[in-house]
Regions:
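Structural alpha/beta surface segment adjacent to cysteine/selenocysteine redox centers
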Residues: 79-170
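Extracytoplasmic thiol/disulfide redox context detector
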Residues: 2-111
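Long hydrophobic alpha-helices with heptad-repeat/coiled-coil character
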Residues: 25-28, 39, 44-51, 150-171
Length: 171
């Protein structure tokens, strides 16, 4: 027992000593990346393409590729969207950062309708629709949770257009 106490007492000072003073090295230095021009007449936030796993906004050749695995019904994802969209769009518009959103089904069928609706009009409207769904999540999420197991079964195998009609009739 005494050895455990000694080891425990020495652990903190040893850990702190291992941290050092922070003067041993310097952060790497480099020049800021030059902005990359968007295609004529557009901003990079207007350049959206479908990827294998989601949708990418911005320069597909950007030095930094930011990927979010998000769920339409996730409150944390909604908070991230509401709080970061403006700043993220600013980073994307410089051409050095791209943002890809990949759907992640945290809550199963409840996540499907929003993703399907956001894809209906093609890549150009995907991000504005996702942002709108996140911004209004608390209002529509209560309605989605009223879908019965029988209705969930009916939605199985429906395409985006059929799913949209079904949901429009429900709400």
């Amino acid at each position: 027992m005494r050895i455990k106490s000694i080891i425990t007492a020495l652990a903190l000072p040893i850990a702190l000593a291992a941290c050092g003073t922070g003067t041993e090295g310097e952060l790497p230095k480099g020049e800021a990346l030059a902005n990359v021009a968007a295609p004529a007449g557009k901003q990079w936030t207007e350049v959206v393409s479908k990827t294998e796993e989601g949708y990418r906004m911005g320069n597909p050749e950007a030095k930094l590729q930011f990927v979010e695995y998000g769920a339409i019904t996730c409150p944390g994802c909604a908070q991230f969207s509401v709080q970061s969209t403006e700043e993220l769009n600013g980073l994307v518009n410089n051409g050095n950062v791209s943002f890809e959103f990949r759907p992640f089904m945290v809550h199963g069928i409840q996540d499907m309708p929003g993703f399907l609706l956001a894809q209906c009009n093609g890549p150009e409207t995907f991000f504005p629709l996702i942002e709108a769904l996140f911004a209004d999540q608390q209002n529509w999420l209560g309605k989605i949770s009223t879908i019965t197991p029988a209705e969930q079964q009916q939605m199985q195998g429906k395409g985006p257009a059929e799913m949209s009609k079904f949901l429009a009739g429900k709400f």
